[in-house]
Amino acid sequence: KWFIFLKIYDKKAIRQHAINMIKELDIRCKSPSQPVRRLSGGNQQKVCLARAFTLKPKILFVSEPTRGIDVGAKRLVLNYLVRMNREKGITIVMTSSELAELRSICDRIAIVSEGKLSAILKPTDSDAEFGMAMAGKFQEVIIDE
């Protein structure tokens, strides 16, 4: 056991949690003790997500969570984010340049154009509405809960 900041940490529990996260996010590594810097970029991204969820946040801010991850692993990561939102009630605020990705998992999508909120749209809104919002030409901010 380690004493860090006057808390007791159980090394076996930490290792088991690491193994669970490795399986959950399909992190390709030789062992749980392999240095993260020795992993591929995509697996490093998954480790970042695993670390963030280990803290059991109520709100999680993620930016480009699938950057550097292969197509098959993208779906796994996105499904994991959705599952943590639904099962654990974690609010996830995500930034991404991948509109299709956002539309596939988000309840609402805020469009920022030239540093200003242009619109808040539903993923089912039309491509034309998204285009206008991204161009900063949307007439009003739509907030629909």
Residue ranges and their predicted role:
Residues 108, 120:
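Short, glycine/charged-rich "phosphate-handling" switch motifs in NTP-dependent
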Residues 102-104:
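A short, surface-exposed alpha-helical micro-motif characterized by mixed small hydrophobic
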Residues 49:
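Hydrophobic anchor residue at the start of the ABC signature
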Residues 75-87:
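Helical segment within the ABC ATPase nucleotide-binding domain
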Residues 60-64:
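Catalytic Walker B motif of ABC-type/P-loop ATPase nucleotide-binding domains
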Residues 1-39, 127-138:
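Conserved P-loop NTPase catalytic core
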Residues 54-58:
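A short, proline-enriched helix->beta-strand linker immediately N-terminal to the Walker B motif
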